[in-house]
Amino acid sequence: MTMQRLCATLFRAIPALTLVLAAGAASADPIYWTDWIGADTDPGPGFIGHGNITTPTATVNVTYTNAAGIGFYQSSGGIDYWTPRTPGTNSPYTSAQVDNPPTGTDIIALRYAGDQTLTFSQSIVNPVFAFVSLNGNGYAFLNQDFEILSFGAGLGAAAPGNHSCGYWGCGTVSKQVVDLGGGNIEYRLIGTGEPHGAIRFTGTFDSLTWRSMTSEYWNGFTVGVQNTANEANPPTGVPLPATWLLMVAGGAGLLASRRGRKTSL
């Protein structure tokens, strides 16, 4: 194959390769959910739970603290409150951004109004927060906006609620934005009925704090991530696939130009 034919072949391949790369970037990624460990037999005041998130290249230690206490802590076996799981596209926890519902049966069930915090041993990116049975309750996040990805209001409901109902039934959620003054804004996730679903926070996090707005036994949650901060923003030095594509195209163009100048002499 001559150099000119090689260059022409590469240029013809660029549109197809670009579409492949774009499709890959637009698709949902698997979520790596927290594996809650241990069995704290005292869910009362001062509760602390521990877990791990294992991604392809890292293990993130997760610590959950709640001064008021919780309803119960399920870290091994027990009822699977994250059903229905099949088909996956109908799950109240999956969406265009989330491929898979929470893994296993692990869940932290909440009971009391008040603040609680998740702390991560290394920075994570765009955490996904899955919730069960947020009926007659709400979660309030101070100065931390979120996106409602999905919830189970029934397959015929409007998006993003067009998913199967959860373990305890159907429901809806909405976001309320409340200006508290002094530069503080509270973003509230409000449930009606028996909502089960998932929300996502955008950005890099070492911790996440929220407030249960009312006491109610019980509503539950877990948390997962697509990437750690290091995975989402790898050290420079290794070109990404799109970068390689541009390098090949540029090199081919340069060679073609030089070849053309040679033959014209």
Question: PLM features: residue spans?
Answer:
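A short, hydrophobic C-terminal helix/tail in secreted or cell-surface proteins
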Residues: 239-257
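N-terminal secretory signal peptides that target proteins for export/translocation
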Residues: 1-9, 263-265
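Short beta-strands within extracellular/lumenal beta-sheet-rich domains
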Residues: 104-121, 136-142, 195-197
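N-terminal targeting leaders for non-cytosolic proteins
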Residues: 29-112, 147-186
